Amino acid sequence: MAIEFIRCKNYYNEINSILENLEKKYLLPEVVKEANFIHGEKLNAILKEVSRDMHENVKYYRDMQLDYREYIETWVHEIKTPIASTKLIIENNQNEVTNKIDSQMNRIEGFVEQVLYYSRSSNVNKDYMIKSINLDNVVRNVIKRNYRDFIHKRIKIDIQDIDEIVYSDGKWIEFIINQIIGNSIKYSNNKEQMIRIYTIKKTNSVLLAIEDNGVGIVPKDINRVFEKGFTGENGRRFSKSTGMGLYLCEKLCSKLGMKIIIESEVNKGTRVTLIFPLSGMATIEPCL
């Protein structure tokens, strides 16, 4: 009886010790030793059954997530066809009405793109391809995508020397820059609007700054702009916003080993800076 008690005490002490040092508690059944007394053997069997059931449930929900993502990607692919057809019709029948329709089609296209990147963002490691990219090429692609809005809102673009090579994924970076420039367009004001784009070369990083002279962001909102679904005062005042653009930018930057910072002053403008590390993780340094 005394021997059984000692075995039981040692067994539970070992379990408590493992739990205290185990970061992922659910792995307990995988690391606990086999018991050498009756009650311990029963507990071992229960733990193994619980572990097996947990793994089956995790696999079930992982498969569901994969199915959902594949459905979203198929849906995005299919919906791009009517969007492209509509834009072609608009291109061949330009007038005041079709120009307004084109503007709304661009919004729809942007929302569709957000859906695609959101579905991929949870598993971005399997989607991106790191290679050398020229920032000038990526930025000019984004400018071309938005040229109608620049003309319509009479926004001037000042692209300084941004002919820098960085290592990242071109499609992700283009999406991020498009979200930032899209915000500059959306929150422009009635005065002479300007978007200035430039780079700063640091010892261990390249900084790409996108600066506008729009309405700016109120101080109470500036620390929340990267929150999922946060629209803030500007989102309520100017247009219906999803609150997903900057959230996705920050999430993707983090997964790509980059940094994104935002500075703003009401009625003076906003500057968003992307920090591309040249080696390892970049350190945030003042832009000025």
Residue spans of the language-model regions?
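Short helix-loop "hinge" at the ATP-lid/N-box region of the Bergerat-fold HATPase_c
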Residues: 184-185
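Short beta-strand/loop element within the Bergerat-fold HATPase_c
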Residues: 194-204
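Glycine-rich GHKL/ HATPase_c ATP-binding element in histidine kinases
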Residues: 268-270
